[in-house]
UniProtKB/Swiss-Prot annotation:
It catalyses: a ubiquinone + NADH + 5 H(+)(in) = a ubiquinol + NAD(+) + 4 H(+)(out). GO terms for biological process: ATP synthesis coupled electron transport; electron transport coupled proton transport. The chain crosses the membrane at residues 22-42, 59-79, 95-115, 116-136, 148-168, 191-211, 223-243, 257-277, 282-302, 309-329, 350-370, 433-453. One of its GO terms (cellular component) is mitochondrial membrane. This is NADH-ubiquinone oxidoreductase chain 4. Belongs to the complex I subunit 4 family. One of its GO terms (molecular function) is ubiquinone binding. It is found in: Mitochondrion membrane. It is a multi-pass membrane protein.
């Protein structure tokens, strides 16, 4: 972990001193080296449930850590096109903010101390807010930033209160120590209150349906790198927090509230799928689809089953790659057409046929088509034996496929608008970007052990 943090610090320093002509190549090369260093952890045989008492890398954290480092160079590659014409100071600031977010995510996904986890968890807010308000497309970006900061901050305050109460009760905020002390020295009532305070921050951060109002605004107004990082990684902080703290929750509280929460999450996924069908803004549609997917992730965690939690992690990794690719594809269309309205950008297959291929692949992956995140969807079949109510909502969630097909049908089929006939063709940089999103997806089904939690019992 220290190696990854030092590489991130070196990237920050380099972005200030490298020349203008070499800024993007050097930064992307360094971020690629960061990705390789993270991938090298996969074959580390010393990785177990608890690696040491300050930082940990287990089979729950490792996939999310690798995903964070993998998407950093991809976000920079996607942003290079529209940032090249800005002043060099703005370009350096943008790169530094992306690196700060990556460093905070590395600390978050490798932290055993809950207070360090909370600090790194909240540190991601400030650079993301600056990305939205400074490099957003329209004046509504300030309102989007206001929604983003207030929802996430007010949702995190109860978590801070619960951590303070946890420290005074157990004299420690290290997760292994808390597992031994907290559950044996507190009543079921105090554990229930602590559980209710803790999950609110994660439900807002994911977010599930009902806590999601900040997400569509933030996605629509954010630049492409902000949307990619927000959808692919920052939303996963909520799911990771739920999975990490699930062992500290009261069994009585979980058994009492699991069924209502799982049913609510499944119902929210169904509602957001219907909302997606009514959307005309491409980025808003992808943002609402993220709400639906993360609601299903929360349902898998709340089910407390091995298959449900493994399915949640599998779906988070696959959704991170697919949603990032969809936002990158939406950005390529926006750069050429100047609009995100689906009806106006129709008929793109006649203008950008190679991009149509990537749209087909990613829309199919978004609905769980093999070889993508199908195994994550299969793991959720465990719901059928867990609760009959979940099986009902799971059957109705076939609506998911409708909006994924609608994205491809409306944007790629039909006659082209006349003002789109002279747009530039696709660049090799863009095809490389989409290919690097696809390659990890193809590894999930043949090698699921890279993602599944090995120590979970």
């Amino acid at each position: 972990m220290i190696t990854l943090i030092f590489i991130s610090i070196g990237m920050t320093l380099t972005s200030f001193v490298v020349s203008k002509n070499n800024l993007w190549p050097v930064t992307i090369l360094q971020s690629a080296f960061l990705s390789i260093a993270a991938i090298a952890l996969i074959n580390n045989h010393w990785i177990s449930k608890w690696h040491n008492f300050i930082n940990s890398v287990d089979s729950m954290q490792l996939p999310l850590l690798v995903l964070s480092c993998w998407l950093t160079p991809l976000a920079l590659i996607a942003s290079k096109g529209h940032l090249n014409n800005l002043p060099i100071t703005n370009q350096r600031t943008f790169i530094v903010l992306v690196i700060i977010i990556t460093t905070s995510l590395i600390i978050t996904f490798s932290s055993l101390e809950l207070i360090l986890f909370y600090i790194a968890f909240e540190t991601t807010l400030v650079p993301t807010l600056i990305l939205i308000t400074r490099w957003g497309a329209l004046m509504e970006r300030f309102q989007a930033g206001l929604y983003f900061i207030f929802y996430t901050l007010f949702g995190s305050l109860p978590l801070l209160i619960s951590l303070i109460a946890l420290y005074f009760s157990s004299n420690s905020l290290s997760i292994p120590n808390v597992e031994l002390v907290w559950l044996t020295t507190n009543s079921s009532t105090s554990l229930t209150v602590w559980w209710l305070l803790s999950i609110l921050a994660f439900l807002v951060k994911m977010p599930i349906y009902g806590f999601h109002l900040w997400l569509p605004k933030a996605h629509v107004e954010a630049p492409v790198a902000g949307s990619m990082i927000l959808a692919a990684i920052l939303l996963k902080l909520g799911g990771y927090g739920l999975m990490r703290l699930i062992s500290l929750f009261s069994t009585t509280s979980l058994n009492f509230s699991s069924l209502p929460l799982v049913v609510f999450c499944c119902w929210g996924a169904l509602v957001t799928s219907i909302i997606c069908i009514r959307q005309t803004d491409l980025k808003a549609l992808i943002a609402y689809s993220s709400v639906g997917h993360m609601s299903i992730v929360a349902a898998g965690v709340f089910s407390q089953t091995i298959w449900g939690i493994n399915g949640a992690l599998m779906l988070m990794i696959a959704h991170g790659l697919v949603s990032s690719a969809l936002f990158a594809l939406a950005n390529t269309m926006y750069e050429r057409s100047g609009t995100r309205t689906l009806v106006i950008t129709r008929g793109m297959k006649l203008i950008l046929p190679l991009s149509t291929f990537w749209w087909l692949i990613m829309c199919a992956a978004n609905l769980g088509f093999p070889y993508s995140n199908l195994i994550g969807e299969i793991l959720y079949i465990s719901w059928y034996g867990w609760s009959i109510w979940c099986s009902y909502f799971s059957n109705y969630n076939c609506v998911w496929g409708v909006y994924s097909l609608m994205i491809f049908q409306v944007s790629q089929q039909g006659p082209s608008s006349h003002f789109l006939l002279n747009v530039p063709t696709s660049f090799s940089r863009e095809h490389l970007l989409f290919l690097l999103h696809l390659l990890p997806l193809l590894l999930i089904i043949p090698t699921p052990n890279l993602v599944l939690i090995s120590w979970l019992k």
